[in-house]
Amino acid sequence: MQKIRNIAIIAHVDHGKTTLVDKMMLAGNLLKEQDNDNLTLDNNDLERERGITILSKNVSIQYKGTKINIIDTPGHSDFGGEVERVLNMADGCILLVDAFEGPMPQTRFVLQKALQIGLKPIVVVNKVDKPNCRPDEVHEMVFDLMFSLDATEEQLDFPVIFGSAKNNWMSTDWRKQTNDITPLLDAILEHIPAPEHLEGTPQMLITSLDYSPYTGRIAIGRVHRGTLTEGANITLVNRNGEQSKMKIKELHTFEGLGRKKTDAVNSGDICAIVGLDKFEIGDTVCDFENPEALPPIAIDEPTMSMLFTINDSPFFGKEGKFVTSRHIQERLEKELDKNLALRVKKDPEEDAWTVFGRGVLHLSVLIETMRREGYELQVGQPQVIYKEIDGVRCEPIEELTINVPTDYSSKMIDMITRRKGEMLSMEAQGERVNIEFNVPSRGIIGLRTNVLTASAGEAIMAHRFKEYQPYKGDIERRTNGSMVAMESGTAFAYAIDKLQDRGRFFINPQEEVYAGQVVGEHIHENDLVINVTKSKKLTNMRASGSDDKARIVPPIIFSLEEALEYIKEDEYLEVTPKSMRMRKIILDELERKRANKQ
């Protein structure tokens, strides 16, 4: 029997989780020194750009004759579905905290789940090489956090390791620098329990899946008890208790970054099974004769929905490869296989789908991925999902933490209370304050841009879903109207220049626009239809000095999330591989007026 340790790594965005795993792989001689510029784990472009881990990866290293399976978890609560299933594979966890920032709200979300399952934590205080960091205070903050999350006595007695993953050292005392990260690996062997070796009929809970064009879907999970062998007949039990008989074609275990084919897998190890059919995440693989299912994973309910529809704008099909409803339908179905917290509902009459997810980030990552693959689609404004609880209409409430310089704190509090938020606590940390609120999810849509503008870009904002509470009343939305293009054509600098006192533009001169496209923000509340395609009429009469150059303020450029949060109820965001345009749902001006009158 090989010795095994299964650990999950929990950390806030950008505290260095993926870097730490890279260094552990270096210690296990998986990577050569020269490969260590790029982060090996964040392997899709989106993750590298945003510095967030969306999908969990599995890696295993050998150390002192023990196999350590490292499971990288997504830190953001929008990916709640991912987090929970991943933690089910681990026996212990490493909580990674920044020596300056301390534990953040999203760390709290994952940590709470880990403590509930009963994982034993090791705390790593990272980035102690940074100036003005405060490792000892952070250590106390972690203790208080665990205490407030109802950790057991045993969990509270956690070992602490200090170090800098980037500079490749870890030590039990932050003042004594070492040369490598072995203190951390030793702590893992010492403090994290080995998986229990349970004899009996085999059981394995499927916690994630992979897809290969050759073998189809591959089930990944941790063998709970017994031994799985290649070629064995098994029973698959799904959530509803229905059974189906199948055969294991191939078994793979994780080794390094890849997988290795094997004949048998013992309890406690993590493996991948090829050859199963029609399984879902949360199903159990069990014995052929007397199947006993494990309890399925509870997954967080979605809290937001968005309308996806085919692109029907005048520029339809110019930039994307996949534009028809059949393409979008297939792509969404494929996403449902992997993305646990997602739900999709097709509109029977039109080519439209309502997609439910955990938050704006969760949905925007899907849209961004589709866009890069060459899809064209339109999305509506994000809507919050309401629930009836005991006959009362309830809405999702989130816990929001904002960290800003003290001068801006009153502005923040004012802005959030106007969005029906209630302030829970406020503590000063040097020149900055940390403020906590409970805010309806509706109030968070579109909040980030305003918070950053009001605090001159200094605010750090994080939020996570808390619970459903009774409806809090109406919230004021964006009050400015839109400037809408009157006719299709090329936008001219001359026209834009003459209209600048009417509001701010989103387009550059010489950009193609179509009638009904939103080209700017009006300074007043009503929508304004303008003609940006007017060019200057040329005559050969010239008075000296009357010819002014057009001077144009640079346009506002939106990121995908900002655009989603910006659009109104009667607008769509058109997303194509090359551009994003906001538009009115009804493009024709007369029809829009008619619809508004009714």
Each predicted region: which residue ranges?
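A short, contiguous, amphipathic alpha-helix enriched in charged residues
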Residues: 313-336, 549, 553
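Canonical P-loop GTPase G-domain recognition
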Residues: 120, 130-190
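Interdomain boundary/hinge elements
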Residues: 36-41, 149-161, 195-205, 241-254, ...
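Short glycine/threonine-rich beta-strand-turn micro-motifs
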Residues: 164, 347-362
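P-loop NTPase switch module centered on the Walker A-proximal segment
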Residues: 1-97, 101-103, 137, 141, ...
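Long insertion/accessory domains within large nucleic-acid-processing enzymes
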Residues: 254, 259-262, 394, 439, ...
